[in-house]
Swiss-Prot record:
Keywords: Methylation, Ribonucleoprotein, Ribosomal protein, RNA-binding, rRNA-binding. One of its GO terms (cellular component) is cytosolic large ribosomal subunit. It holds the Pfam family Ribosomal_L11. One or more lysine residues are methylated. Belongs to the universal ribosomal protein uL11 family. Forms part of the ribosomal stalk which helps the ribosome interact with GTP-bound translation factors. This is Large ribosomal subunit protein uL11. InterPro entries: Ribosomal_uL11 (IPR000911), Ribosomal_uL11_bac-typ (IPR006519), Ribosomal_uL11_C (IPR020783), Ribosomal_uL11_C_sf (IPR036769), Ribosomal_uL11_N (IPR020784), Ribosomal_uL11_N_sf (IPR036796). Part of the ribosomal stalk of the 50S ribosomal subunit. Interacts with L10 and the large rRNA to form the base of the stalk. L10 forms an elongated spine to which L12 dimers bind in a sequential fashion forming a multimeric L10(L12)X complex. Gene3D superfamilies: Ribosomal protein L11, C-terminal domain (1.10.10.250), Ribosomal protein L11/L12, N-terminal domain (3.30.1550.10). GO terms for biological process: translation. It comes from Alkaliphilus oremlandii (strain OhILAs). GO terms for molecular function: large ribosomal subunit rRNA binding; structural constituent of ribosome.
């Protein structure tokens, strides 16, 4: 028989840097999960993606065991990494901070495809372009 899920926790943690400190500790502690065990597993699984923020969905079962699924980094994080900026524009409609090529948008869309609710690569590219525009990044053809 399948284990009964008693809770789902969604967090965004820096790859390879999960620690029992907030936000990880309190979120897992209230469900009775082994915090150090999770941190070690997560850090081992994401060590190769250092510097990126990794969304993770943790399923907690009735016997206090858990499983987790890592997702691809948020589009905004990938865009910032691709063009080498620290943050997006505070006023994206007035002040543009950088430019990004369609090729880089395509690369990001291909990477994000498993997590996006898009039927085609073109639809995924459109979503990533929208994220870039909302950050004050100009999308070039």
């Amino acid at each position: 028989m399948a284990k009964k899920i008693v809770g789902q926790i969604k967090l965004q943690i820096n790859a390879g840097k999960a620690t029992p400190a907030p936000p990880v500790g309190p979120a897992l502690g209230q469900h009775g999960v082994n915090i150090m065990g999770f941190c070690k597993e997560f850090n081992a699984k994401t060590a190769d993606q250092a510097g990126l923020i990794i969304p993770v969905v943790i399923s907690v079962y009735q016997d206090r065991s858990y499983s987790f699924i890592t997702k691809t980094p948020p589009a905004a994080v990938l865009i910032k990494k691709a063009i080498g900026i620290q943050s997006g524009s505070g006023e994206p409609n007035k002040k543009k901070v950088a430019k990004i090529s369609k090729d880089k948008i395509r690369e990001i869309a291909e990477l994000k495809m498993p997590d996006l609710n898009a039927a085609s690569l073109e639809a995924a590219m459109s979503m990533i372009s929208g994220t870039a525009r909302s950050m004050g990044v100009v999308v070039e053809d």
